[in-house]
């Protein structure tokens, strides 16, 4: 997803401020007992109780022994058989984007162009701002499954610029006035790494702007104030707690957002752990690269250690860079948003400074170019010259891979940061984009694992809903939420439930250099837990989606509790 911020209506902020309240414990000690605990640890995979003191686990095992070891003032919670997992981690998400989705014009799930137009009509009647901005539409299940064009928007709103972002964050549709304000005409050339879609008959711009063409309009949208951005960050963080995340790995942030996050932590308005990468290339990322690794921050729940880069665009908007043309658009092979030498330069310097690099790559060409750049950087900076010997560079998404590149992840020590929900969302258009042979290398979780790679699981929210239960379900079923799986949709790539759990717990901790602190329920580790109403490791596939988050616990503190939860 591209990082773009939006102005929201100030009056929308008022009812959401209540979400900031952070429940706190009267005691620093906590006992969870009569529980169904999956520790994620190889030697003792199951337990029935855990004891926490000062934010860390001091005992894991039987209920009777836990009660004996607990300090006298410990808060004791009888979970009545609820399932406890190591605190779940979203290893790829966009925090402010989650908040903006909650706060402004959300088009997620609109079933048709007509429905989008009706939603826009309603919005225009109530939004008197100079611009109308929204996000979340996807055309793949419309009839016909075609991108909207500026005339579709003009029919509803012609007197103000309108910018509507596709759900993948890599394309927008705008109305004619927005094109005029930006000075985009039939003669405007495509910017490097972007495309201005034009009508093949008239040569006029259609209103669809892909990847690096988006800023031609988006840079004209009024920027949000600090208070609006702060509210978006707070809303995104607290929404993440409600769905069970204990850490979010923020794929592309800014100096401004880091400053605002520090304020939110100091004001006790957020509790979510974060592991962040600076958005690059750009001035903030370059300053970070010059400064070197900055793991220490304003709060021990916030770590800034990486730089996020982009190689290509998205598959749905045909910006993903492919080795051969799109099967449904033979004139296109996608886009390169940055030249490989940019990735190589930053990766090489990052190795010397101890900074992790994570690069967005979706198409098979995009992934190959990133692997090539990483390999060249590793060769240029031997271990003796690195601040961190094992850099754990990542490729974000790794969606479409040529068979020859799958073993390279393990060989190079590159982590595949993947989002299993993408497979069940994209199954409606990926086969037509890729064709029957190339689609076999798409969302290739099993192939990567069998080749020795490490996969870390995230959501890419707000591109996807951002729900760990959906990610777990998608990993083990590779089916849509209604149970549908397209023909030849690669069900052999499914994961076991144990692997799916590691995808959301231990492997994200490893990807953040935190496997000694988080990712399993073991003595000495941070007391981060996600407590569910159902045993997702055992129930039938269809019942996984019925599981609810009852508690989210971070450092032994209950930071979210379901309203109906009854403590015993």
Task: Give the positions of each predicted feature.
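Bacterial N-terminal signal peptides
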Residues: 10-24
């Amino acid at each position: 997803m591209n990082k773009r911020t939006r102005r929201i209506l100030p009056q929308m902020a008022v009812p959401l401020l209540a979400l900031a309240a952070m429940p706190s414990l009267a005691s620093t000690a906590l006992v969870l007992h009569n529980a169904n605990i999956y520790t994620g640890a190889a030697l003792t995979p199951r337990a029935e109780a855990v004891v926490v003191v000062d934010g860390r686990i001091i005992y894991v095992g039987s209920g009777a022994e836990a009660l004996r070891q607990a300090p006298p003032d410990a808060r004791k919670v009888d979970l009545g058989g609820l399932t406890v997992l190591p605190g779940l981690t979203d290893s790829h998400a966009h925090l402010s984007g989650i908040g903006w989705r909650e706060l402004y014009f959300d088009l997620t799930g609109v079933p048709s162009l007509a429905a989008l137009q009706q939603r826009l009509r309603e919005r225009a009647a109530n939004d008197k701002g100079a611009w109308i901005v929204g996000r979340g539409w996807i055309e793949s299940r419309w009839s016909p499954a075609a991108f909207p064009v500026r005339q579709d928007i003009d029919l509803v709103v012609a007197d103000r610029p309108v910018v509507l972002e596709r759900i993948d964050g890599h394309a927008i549709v705008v109305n004619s006035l927005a094109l005029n304000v930006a000075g985009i005409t039939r003669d405007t050339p495509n910017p490097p790494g972007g495309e201005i879609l034009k009508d093949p008959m008239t040569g006029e711009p259609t209103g669809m702007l892909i990847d690096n063409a988006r800023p031609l309009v988006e840079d004209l949208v009024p920027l949000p104030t600090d208070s609006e951005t702060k509210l978006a960050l707070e809303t995104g963080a607290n929404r993440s707690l409600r769905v069970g995340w204990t850490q979010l790995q923020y794929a592309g942030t800014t100096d401004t957002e880091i400053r605002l996050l520090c304020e939110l932590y100091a004001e006790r308005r957020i509790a979510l752990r974060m592991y962040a990468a600076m958005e690059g290339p750009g001035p903030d990322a370059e300053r970070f690269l010059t400064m070197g690794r900055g793991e220490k921050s304003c709060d021990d729940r916030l770590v800034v250690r990486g730089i996020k880069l982009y190689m290509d665009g998205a598959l749905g908007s045909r910006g993903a860079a492919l080795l051969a043309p799109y099967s449904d658009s033979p004139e296109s092979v996608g886009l390169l948003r940055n030249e490989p030498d940019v990735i190589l330069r930053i990766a090489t310097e990052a190795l010397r400074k101890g900074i992790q690099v994570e690069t967005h790559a979706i198409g098979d060409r995009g992934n190959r170019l990133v692997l090539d750049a990483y390999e060249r950087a590793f060769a240029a900076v031997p271990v003796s010259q690195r601040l961190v010997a094992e850099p754990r560079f990542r490729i974000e998404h790794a969606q479409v891979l040529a068979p020859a590149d799958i073993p390279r992840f393990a060989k190079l020590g590159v982590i595949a940061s993947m989002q299993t929900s993408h497979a069940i969302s994209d199954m409606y258009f990926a086969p037509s984009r890729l064709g029957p042979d190339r689609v076999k290398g798409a969302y290739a979780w099993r192939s990567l694992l069998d080749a020795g790679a490490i996969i870390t699981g995230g959501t890419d929210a707000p591109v996807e809903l951002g729900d760990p239960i959906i990610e777990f379900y998608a990993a083990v079923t590779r089916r849509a939420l209604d149970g549908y799986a397209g023909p030849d949709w690669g069900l052999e790539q499914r994961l076991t439930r144990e692997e799916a759990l590691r995808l959301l717990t231990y492997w994200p901790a490893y990807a953040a250099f935190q496997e000694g602190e988080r990712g399993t329920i073991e003595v000495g580790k941070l007391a981060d837990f996600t407590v569910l109403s159902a045993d997702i490791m055992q129930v039938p596939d269809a019942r996984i989606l019925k599981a609810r988050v009852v508690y989210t616990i971070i450092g032994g503190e209950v930071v979210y509790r379901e309203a109906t939860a009854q403590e015993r």
